[in-house]
Amino acid sequence: MKIFAPGRFDRLPDAILFDTDNTLYPYDPAHTAAQQAVRNKVVNTFSIKPEVFDAAFKEARQQVKTRLKHTASSHSRLLYLQRMLEIMGLGSQVLLALDFEQTYWRTFLSNAVLFDEVKDL
């Protein structure tokens, strides 16, 4: 590897971030389980039909992606869920949005199963 600015690499980094989706584990099963858990929680919390959740979430996701374009935050479940609550006429419900986001990630992580080829450290 050719380093064009060696002066910028005079020490080891404090942390390295990398995308693990479909590298260490399959993304789709974990995402599907997490999305279903959030859907169930929202449907039960507000006594709405699943289709209402589906439509509001889809619209919220599209609006966030359109507004934030190609930024990392355009993938934020928290922003999707907060906007979904607004679309549903519930206004700014930050604590609910956080609760729903935590449900997503808790379920996602508990369903993210490593590929067989991934070695134990």
Set out the residue ranges of the language-model regions.
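Short amphipathic alpha-helical interaction patches enriched in hydrophobic/aromatic residues
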Residues: L24, V42, R61-L68, F108
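A metal-dependent, Asp-based hydrolase signature
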Residues: E59-Q102
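Active-site neighborhood of HAD-like aspartate-dependent phosphohydrolases
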Residues: K2-F18, T23-A56
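Conserved phosphate-coordination/catalytic loops
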Residues: H75, A112-D116
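Catalytic-core regions built around general acid/base machinery
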Residues: E117-L121
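Surface-exposed cleft-lining segments at the edges of enzyme active sites
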Residues: T103-A112
